[in-house]
Amino acid sequence: PVDDVIKEMLETQGWDAHEHAYISEYVKLFLRAMRKFMHTEALIIPNEDLDLVDATYLTYQSMGGALRLTVGCRMTGNVLLAMAGRFSGEEETEVNEMAIDSIEELANVINGLYIVNMSGHSHDMDLDMPKTLENGVPAGEDVFALRVETEFGAFMLYLSREGFMLNEKNLFGW
């Protein structure tokens, strides 16, 4: 069903069949990573935005080379802390440098696995450094979003071929 959901979403935005395959592969890898690193099942819900009432955080990373893809997760502070804690194995109680480092390392691991998989299909790719900013909302012509539901809360997964248009003035930097 993931392939069908992705195909339908991408067709409405004019992406071609080749792009369906590599985006679908990313989403499936992301869901497997949720099981492995977050110890939870994740359900994707297409075309349904998530009203994130409290301050939100966006962690994103761009991949370049043979294929270009930028991915990001937009989440509440509580979801960020839950993900960072599950990944690091330590209890995270506040959004600070340690929590941000954990969530960015999770992005590095997931996206690193993806580019290794893509190299197996003769698509050499590289990773930019992950970034996290407060109150960031990805924008751009080809950005599409999936709502991800987990036992520790919901968040948005954004994907784009061309990158996100963002105001990075709220970028965390330690």
Where are these regions (language model features)?
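N-terminal auxiliary interaction/assembly segments of multi-subunit proteins
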Residues: 1-174
